[in-house]
Amino acid sequence: MSEESNEETKIIELEDIPGVGPETARKLREAGYSTIEAVAVASPSELANVGGITEGNAVKIIQAARKLANIGGFESGDKVLERRRSVKKITTGSKDLDELLGGGVETQAITEFFGEFGSGKTQICHQLAVNVQLPEDEGGLEGSVIIIDTENTFRPERIIQMAEAKGLDGNEVLKNIYVAQAYNSNHQMLLVDNAKELAEKLKKEGRPVRLIIVDSLMSHFRAEYVGRGTLADRQQKLNRHLHDLMKFGELYNAAIVVTNQVMARPDVLFGDPTKPVGGHIVAHTATFRIYLKKGKDDLRIARLIDSPHLPEGEAIFRVTERGIEDAEEKDKKKRKK
């Protein structure tokens, strides 16, 4: 038994990757590659940016790390199903919204909530930051949270309010939420790298990160890249950012939640002209896309518009002082009519 434990410990050390000595391991850790999984999912060009590693050596190091971490290559469908069993779900606070999402917000997936101002995007983020800390039998994952705040919308007072409604100590809940304000798109991307270092530290302390939130995803990208001439550069940068988030989710079995802004399509004459910003890059990378709309008073309507395995559908929920809650039956019936 002890030999197996030693072997597992060896596997997670960077120095055990063929071609990686103590000095290279030190440089990798300083660059944010603190585990063999992080090395295994890196690209050769990314690793070549670490001092002293050529692109040729980077390819060899990545291949060796993939073998040790058992990442890459083909696997049978039943093995994929077995791996899918490690996926967890976080309750939103509303049974109907959870049902729409197939049981809650999934780990190892990007869930995008988009809608107009006041549609409930940030409220859902705050609620998830509380709920992820609940025990598993109550819909949580007993995990920590990282929030990348691009619009200065995080409010600790709201967290305390929602936590106390769940019977939790608000100040204790806040201790497990790590917030960083992103000042531009480069800083936003850098914070994902910093999040990996923080996640490693918290993992060792027995407080694993189970949720990373970006509220909002496109705010800085839209402000900095104006006009059609900059669109290609913006989309390339955005693509890398989303893939970095996805890697984080897979490495730490964390849910990735992003909020997104909307724009009106002038070419749509009938129906709802609203669409999320970010183009095809966001559309293809987000696993679940939920369109949020304002209803009467505290009611909000969530429409699932894209998912790999769930049908399109709608759910009605309420945003109250206590947080995200189910709508009353009479409100649901009115919507169906």
Swiss-Prot record:
Ion transport keyword on record: no
Pfam families found in the cross-reference section: HHH_5, Rad51
GO biological process, alphabetically ordered: DNA recombination; DNA repair
NCBIfam families: PRK04301.1, recomb_radA
Protein function: Involved in DNA repair and in homologous recombination. Binds and assemble on single-stranded DNA to form a nucleoprotein filament. Hydrolyzes ATP in a ssDNA-dependent manner and promotes DNA strand exchange between homologous DNA molecules.
Family: Belongs to the eukaryotic RecA-like protein family.
Protein name, per record: DNA repair and recombination protein RadA
Organism the protein comes from: Archaeoglobus fulgidus (strain ATCC 49558 / DSM 4304 / JCM 9628 / NBRC 100126 / VC-16)
